[in-house]
Amino acid sequence: MTAHIDPLDLAKALIAAPSVTPATGAVFDVLEGALTPLGFTVERFIDGIEPDGPVENLLAVRKGAGPKHFGFAGHLDVVPPGVGWTGDAFVPEVRGDLLYGRGAVDMKGAIAAFVAAAAATPSDAGTLSLIVTGDEEGPAVFGTRALMEHMDARGIRPDMILVGEPTSVNRLGDMVKIGRRGSVNIWIDVPGTQGHVAYPHLADNPIPKLVRILSAIDSVSLDAGTDWFQPSNIEFTDIEVGNGATNVIPASARARLSIRFNDRHRGAELVAMVERIAQDVEPRAKVVGKISGEAFLTPPGELSELVAEAIAAETGLTPEMSTTGGTSDARFLHALCPVV
């Protein structure tokens, strides 16, 4: 037995429920209202405390007779509307064959499409689940990772997961992400002794030391890439000394860098490398890293072939399998099963 859900109507209803990170309440009511009549058991959780919470999360499961469990992961939160909107970003509007509204692409439209597909799937087929968070665009501390803990406590483990992030480049369906690079942000603090520029012998200027540290880091070539990943890259993103005077040697200097790395590296190893370089120049230098996610790869196989066949059937395109771009919650979910 199957049902019918119009994905456009559902997408419009989701867009019409404002859900800037962290999303809670009304937008989850809309999704739950669509899933319950389809036979899904829906659980909603409030996870976390300030400053990164509370966050609402939703886990919906419809058990089937088939042997496979197919999961869909997504997020209902959106980034705040920027300038340039010609109307209310939370009032969905169809112009021609395009749907406009905050979250239409990332990713309320994808969630609506999957719910419509689930409605059209016989209830006696394999098990379907939706893993939906209210915090993917923000800190993501109490989002998908918290949902994974709920799943583990309930013994829920999909065989494969599709993440509904937009990955197309020029045409819908032209690219599928089968992996993502890891990401780590690193802060370097170099201490010194404040003083007057006329008396440098009474001060200890941290800026030349920081410059030497950054120069040494800049000379590092992490790798030449792999079969599936582009070369890892180090980018300096900020330098600050907090010095508004022209005649004062600052007491400290700080820099921030970001590393996007492939699966030849681990985040902690890169933080340790930067720390060694910094302390070779200044033993008192402090290095702190924040790993957003490790690199992962889902080698081409059953899941990517299934997705490619579905795309080809609907669009006539053969999608490119890629690992380019930024991170997504797939960086957490790959620990459960193959994910694209």
Q: Which residues fall in each region the model found?
A:
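Short glycine/serine- and small hydrophobic-enriched flexible loop segments
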Residues: 13, 116-122, 212-219
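Active-site metal-coordination/substrate-binding segment of hydrolases
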Residues: 69-132, 154
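Short alpha-helix boundary/capping segments
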Residues: 41, 99-106, 198-206
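A structural signal for short hydrophobic beta-strand segments in well-ordered beta-sheet cores
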Residues: 42, 60, 92-94, 236-239, ...
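N-terminal helical capping/dimerization or prosegment-like subdomains
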Residues: 1-81, 252-258, 270-276
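Metal-dependent amide/peptide-bond hydrolase catalytic core
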Residues: 1-3, 80, 167-171, 178, ...
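Acidic/histidine-rich catalytic neighborhood of metal-dependent amide-processing enzymes
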Residues: 107-179
